[in-house]
């Protein structure tokens, strides 16, 4: 019994270490780092494109996500961040050259350019003035 308990505890500890050591997928956007997870939010609202959630950002702050668009807190490293979703294809037509009348606009009242640079432009506008 003691041996089984010891092996069980050892296995749980090893599983915990592996889980914590798992690297988050990071990508650069302008001057900021992000972690991404695939997330399909309201799939049929605009198109069947892949929606993305930014849940880890160095400069993250609550004003970037409206109250009703916050889904949950997600852990990234030792900190927790809001998860918010958007799509690269910012008008839902599948070509990534949208005019911004999309989920980005509904979230932030702004205009995206279809290739993800919306984030950099929006952040630059907030932080560089």
UniProtKB/Swiss-Prot annotation:
| Localization annotation | Secreted, Extracellular space, Extracellular matrix
- Alphabetically ordered keywords of this record: Disulfide bond, Extracellular matrix, Repeat, Secreted, Signal
The cysteines joined by S-S bonds are: none
Q: Which GO terms describe its cellular component?
A: extracellular region
Where does the signal peptide begin and end?
A: 1-23
Which ranges does the UniProt record give for the sequence repeats? 91-92, 93-94, 95-96, 97-98, 99-100
Principal localisation: secreted
Region annotation (5 X 2 AA tandem repeats of N-G) maps to 91-100
| Known tissue expression | Component of conchiolin, the organic matrix of nacre. Specifically expressed in mantle epithelium.
Question: What is this protein's function?
Answer: May be specifically involved in the formation of the nacreous layer.
Family note: Belongs to the N16 matrix protein family.
Q: How does it assemble?
A: Heterooligomer; disulfide-linked. Pif97, Pif80, N16 and other proteins form a complex.
The protein in question is named: N16.5 matrix protein
């Amino acid at each position: 019994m003691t041996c089984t308990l010891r092996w069980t505890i050892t296995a749980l500890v090893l599983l915990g270490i592996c889980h914590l050591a798992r690297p988050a997928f990071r990508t650069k956007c302008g001057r900021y780092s992000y972690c991404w997870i695939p997330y399909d939010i309201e799939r049929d609202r605009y198109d069947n494109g892949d929606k993305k959630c930014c849940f880890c950002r160095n400069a993250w702050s609550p004003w970037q996500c409206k109250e009703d668009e916050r889904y949950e807190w997600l852990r990234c490293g030792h900190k927790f961040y809001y998860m918010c979703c958007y799509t690269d294809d910012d008008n839902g037509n599948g070509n990534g050259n949208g005019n911004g009348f999309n989920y980005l606009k509904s979230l932030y009242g702004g205009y995206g350019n279809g290739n993800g640079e919306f984030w950099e432009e929006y952040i630059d506008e907030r932080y560089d003035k």
